[in-house]
Amino acid sequence: MNILITGATGYVGRRVVKQLIENDKNISILTINRDINKAQSILPFSNCKHVSVNDMEKEVLLFSPNICIHLATLSTSRNDDEIINPMIEANITFGVKLLATLFKVDSLQLFINTGSFAEYRNGVENGFNDAYLYTATKSAYRHFVDYYSQLKGFKYINAVPFTIYGGDDTAKKLMDYMMESINAKEPVKMSPGNQILDFVHVDDVVRFYVSAVNSINNISLLPNGSNYYLGTGIGTRVKDLATLIESKIHKRLNIFWGGLNYRPLDVMYAVAPTEDNNQVIPWKTQISLDQGIDKLIKKYDIYEN
């Protein structure tokens, strides 16, 4: 099977590539990159070819992918003038060029698009209501995916990750700031902490993409454009998360609650409606929040004294 992956060197992407190769030594992977040297360093696998975005059309046509996993994105809460052009380029222009290239191949069966829970600021049941400029570009991009899907006839699904944590991402997550606050000299400023979020471990998110690849023979049974909500289905208040961490390490987190204001359109409740996920792709989380925090404590080497 030939799999095309964008964003392969990212937080989720690098884990997806490694897991796919671990599961199937005969798989062939093509990654599209802005920095080939970085890709070769992070993913030095013989059955994984890394090519430049400038050579995308030529290389994709030669590769003839069966599946495309689209993870590349510019994710930020910024909406200032300087971020607009790079965000449109990364989240829309590049993605549309990718689709235009895939239109020229006859092998593609499935396109896995990746969205964000913050596209649904007022809940999935209320449809799109973007919290950030970033998520507005993600919502807009879906229309392009749907257009090319209908034009060419390939199937597509939308993976919608909720609040991902865990692993060794260079971009710090909420839990990382919490853990680092323990030894901080000054309190770490955070919002009032009343958001209720669905914390999903990165390893569980990776399992979804692998499961989708393994389900390729049943993809015809899926309604086109199906959403898969990648979360546990359980919400936890941010302040309660801090309390849970404190109960495990028997130390206080040095946090100044309310030191930062909520963002203008902040998401106050985001829990994955996992019951809506079509079981054609048989996926559910395996790592509870309790287990995930234990992994994080081990990562930071923080134990009760």
Regions found by a protein language model. Give the residues of each.
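Active-site helix of classical SDR
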Residues: L133, T137-A140
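SDR active-site strand-loop-helix element
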Residues: T6, I32, C68-L74, F111-F117, ...
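Conserved Rossmann-fold NAD(P)-dependent oxidoreductase catalytic core, especially the SDR/UDP-sugar
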Residues: H70, V96-L133
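C-terminal "lid/loop" region of Rossmann-like NAD(P)-dependent oxidoreductases
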Residues: T31, G225-Y228, R237-A242, H250-Y269
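Conserved C-terminal active-site "lid" loop/helix of NAD(P)H-dependent oxidoreductases
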Residues: K38, V202, N227, N261-Q291, ...
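NAD(P)-dependent short-chain dehydrogenase/reductase
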Residues: F144-L197, V202-N214, G233, T243-K248
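N-terminal Rossmann NAD(P)H-binding glycine-rich loop of SDR-like oxidoreductase domains
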Residues: I3-N23
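NAD(P)H-binding glycine-rich loop region in Rossmannoid oxidoreductase-like domains
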Residues: S52-A90
